[in-house]
């Protein structure tokens, strides 16, 4: 199957998925959490699979995953919610990465090769490798879901990408899940406000540590965002 046919096939699959989501009202479940909780409790393993599937589809369609992480915290609680969201987020980012690889670099460069995000990511990987991946996962320089596709077009290997994505996603997932679960169960209390402040402080410290790591490794994130990419490297 050539690149153009792959692209048309992928568009057809996306269209069918969107139609099925609309027809079965799957995303409506996210705005009706009591119904979603009941459905999952009655469905057992299928309910967990449904949540993971929704997460993957949302990520492929570039919808914000934080909404689903919050829903997971409310529906599943802090521990199971964190585990399921981590599994779902890891599978989702891997699917986006592999889809970009499958569609092919030459085809996708026609559509995204000129974008500042892709140019910055490819130049950063070429210069700094894994360090750049770690930093862009921790520091919100680019939209997270777009990164998944962009990294699929670079020379980075699949398994390091997947492992690092999972590890760097975990802190945010834990915070969102725990806070959502506590808010759903107890409402806005003094304890919740204190936890919210501590969570914000923890994320701020994490970002600052990532910036210190960037300086230690001599990773110039600002320069990589400004510079255009004129000679992309081929897969090797």
Curated annotation (Swiss-Prot):
Family stated for the protein in its record: Belongs to the TVP38/TMEM64 family.
Location(s), subcellular: Cell membrane
PANTHER family associated with the record: PTHR46826, TVP38_TMEM64 FAMILY MEMBRANE PROTEIN YDJX
Regions crossing the membrane: 7-27, 50-70, 72-92, 156-176, 192-212
Keyword set includes Protein transport: no
Cited InterPro entries: VTT_dom (IPR032816), VTT_domain (IPR053240)
Keywords: Cell membrane, Membrane, Transmembrane, Transmembrane helix
Domain comment in the entry: The VTT domain was previously called the SNARE-assoc domain. As there is no evidence that this domain associates with SNARE proteins, it was renamed as VMP1, TMEM41, and TVP38 (VTT) domain.
Region span, VTT domain: 73-183
Species the sequence originates in: Escherichia coli (strain K12)
The protein's name in its UniProt record: TVP38/TMEM64 family membrane protein YdjX
Signal peptide residues on this chain, from the entry's feature table: none
Gene coding for it: ydjX
GO cellular component terms listed in the entry, alphabetical order: plasma membrane
Topological relation to the membrane, as annotated: Multi-pass membrane protein
Domain of life of the native organism: Bacteria
Transmembrane helix as UniProt keyword: yes
